[in-house]
Regions:
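Carboxylate-rich, polar loop motifs that coordinate divalent cations or form catalytic acidic clusters
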Residues: 1-334
Length: 334
């Protein structure tokens, strides 16, 4: 029951998405932001999932009809014909590159690996991840790989052949499934968001998980870490949270940003899909159900610049902003 709900939610989020390049022009108060749509006919589908830039500068665009690689001029599509063994599930959620330049592909039904030189996709046989709806892949600095999905958290060290489950429990002591987001801090902790189960910290050295028992944090959905080390938590219905000294003992402290009806510069919507920092502008970009919010002052919850969809050239094309990516050349993509 829970797995079917997770898949349905992913599908609704991505309907009608357009990939956009964003150009910023100075203005008197907030900067003017213009959205330049990428031609949709170069993609296998407009149902775009989580964007990713690899070490060679290519932008990878997972869709619900295969995977596209964009080089700034055009796109190459990878689908079922590129699989060397087995059947490639073209409902692609996420990709990530390891230190050997393998591109790992997470789909609604398992894990695949792309050889970037040959273009072949290998259907790796990982029985523990068979039919797993993979939501997040984190390639670690030691060339280990972490996988999160509707079957929980998995890990593969650099020398391992297989992935191994990492048992973690929420604040009620129940096993955590439906992992939706993972980030790593500089203290060897993983921060984990699990749908309807909350925020957890997993100490890699101790092999131990700590659950954040808080009504707002129990709605954690997506995580991000800025250049200053701040951890941001986007929730499913409770806005955005910035953790304050998260490793301190006692209850988890945070700054809460949420939508306030009638306040123009509060957060646009409390259902959050993605968070990305633009360090050059010192802003936090937040994608959600109703559009895009840009936070200009982290100490002021009323400093959001909000964007709704419009019909004019340069307007946001659609309301739901599922993925935000800052590329190494400083451009923002949604």
């Amino acid at each position: 029951m829970h797995r079917r709900f997770l898949i349905s939610r992913f599908f609704i989020v991505c309907i009608g998405f357009v990939l956009s390049e964003i150009q910023i022009v100075a203005a008197e108060s907030f900067p003017q932001v213009r959205f330049t749509p990428l031609p949709s006919d170069i993609l296998p589908s407009n149902e775009v999932r989580k964007l990713y830039q690899d070490s060679d500068g290519y932008i990878w665009i997972p869709t619900y009809n295969g995977l596209a690689r964009y080089d700034g001029y055009g796109a190459i599509t990878y689908g079922m014909r590129d699989v060397s063994n087995g059947l490639f599930n073209t409902f692609v959620n996420v990709v990530a590159e390891d230190h050997d330049k393998n591109l790992w592909i997470g789909t609604e039904h398992g894990l695949f690996r792309l050889d970037k030189v040959s273009g072949n996709i290998v259907a790796d046989e990982y029985p523990e991840l068979a039919d797993c709806n993979i939501a997040v892949i984190l390639c670690d600095t030691g060339n280990g790989i972490w996988i999160g999905g509707d079957k929980g958290l998995f890990r593969k060290n650099a020398l391992d052949r297989n992935f191994h489950p990492v048992p973690i429990s929420n604040s009620a002591g129940r096993p955590v499934k439906a992992v939706t987001s993972i980030i790593k801090d500089d203290k060897l902790n993983l921060w984990i968001a699990a749908f309807d189960q909350g925020l957890l910290r997993y100490d890699i050295r101790e092999d131990r998980a700590y659950a954040c028992d808080d009504a707002v944090l129990r709605k954690a959905h997506v995580l991000a870490r800025d250049v200053a080390g701040n951890i941001w938590v986007g929730t499913w219905g409770a806005g955005v949270v910035r953790l304050v000294n998260p490793l301190a003992p006692g209850p988890t402290r945070y700054v809460h940003y949420k939508h306030v009806p009638g306040r123009t510069h509060s957060l646009l919507d409390d259902i959050i899909y993605d968070i990305e920092e633009n360090p050059e502008q010192n802003t936090i970009w937040i994608g959600g159900r109703s559009g895009l919010s840009i936070l200009h002052d982290i100490d002021n919850p009323d400093s959001f610049q909000n964007f709704f969809p419009g019909d004019n050239v340069g307007d946001l094309p659609y309301n739901e902003v599922n993925s935000i990516l800052r590329t190494r050349d400083g451009l923002m993509w949604i």
